[in-house]
Amino acid sequence: MAQGSIKTAIVTGAASGIGLATAKSLQAAGYRVFGTSRKATVDAGGGTRMLVCDVTDEASIADMFETVFGETGRVDLLVNNAGFGISGPAEETSVAQAQAMFDVNLFGVLRTTQAVLPLMRAQKGGRIVNISSVQGFIPAPYMALYGASKHAVEGYSESLDHEVRGQGIRVVLVEPAFTRTAFDQNLVQPDKPLDIYAADRAGRSKFWNEVMKTADAPEVVAKVVVKAATAEAPKRRYAAGPKARQVSLLRRFVPARAFDKAIRKEMQLPPMS
């Protein structure tokens, strides 16, 4: 492939997990890939150029885009993957904790997207792939605030896609289910635990241990990201992996009460009265 025809991709949160797998898969697909991490010492390997970027800091984002654009003269693909979760009852999570997570999961997406849109518009095209979650369209007991942040990403992405499609830019969602990454190990615990939920915490730990045994590898999600990035006529959303596809179908076609019962059974919650 000639140098001038090589497309440039940026993957935020590329130090590990889905971001790292995506960076490697995009490079294998022919992209010149820049990954971002909050730490300068991270090496994604495989030829991915790692840059320092804090998605909560507009100056850091501007510096990152200036570096990429200065070296390549274009940005064809932005994959917004950086994010983290809070696990626990919604009542136990403080507003400050929730704000910190939304600052990354939602407003980080907003900041990087607003920075890249003028560049994509000037080159008359581009694609933005936002990593959401099945928890962006289903109830997420004991991860309510994380689910809320992904619901917000879904609404933002769908609306933005309509706004910029006429400019040659598409905004696409990729929705993984449980994935074998360090995400579950890095879940932030609520900062104001309540005694009434003490027994639930032990149950949640058991639940996580069980679901992670059958969780998808990050490469499964990365493969779907490449598909979303390269499709000539992309869908607005892509379920990533068999479990995500199953949940998506159930959400669309199963009656609400039956779906609620299925959620409670999956999460090992008491039956509905």
Residue ranges and their predicted role:
Residues 165-212:
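C-terminal beta-strand-loop-alpha-helix "lid" module of Rossmann-like NAD(P)-dependent dehydrogenases
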Residues 15-16:
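Conserved glycine-rich cofactor-binding loop
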Residues 91, 138-144:
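Active-site loop immediately N-terminal to the catalytic Tyr-X3-Lys motif
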Residues 113, 149:
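Active-site helix of classical SDR
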Residues 53-63, 95:
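The beta1-alpha1 cofactor-binding region of Rossmann-like NAD(H)/NADP(H)-dependent oxidoreductases
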Residues 133:
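Residue(s) in the substrate-gating loop at a strand-loop-helix junction
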Residues 89-90, 97-99:
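Substrate-binding pocket helix/loop in short-chain dehydrogenase/reductase
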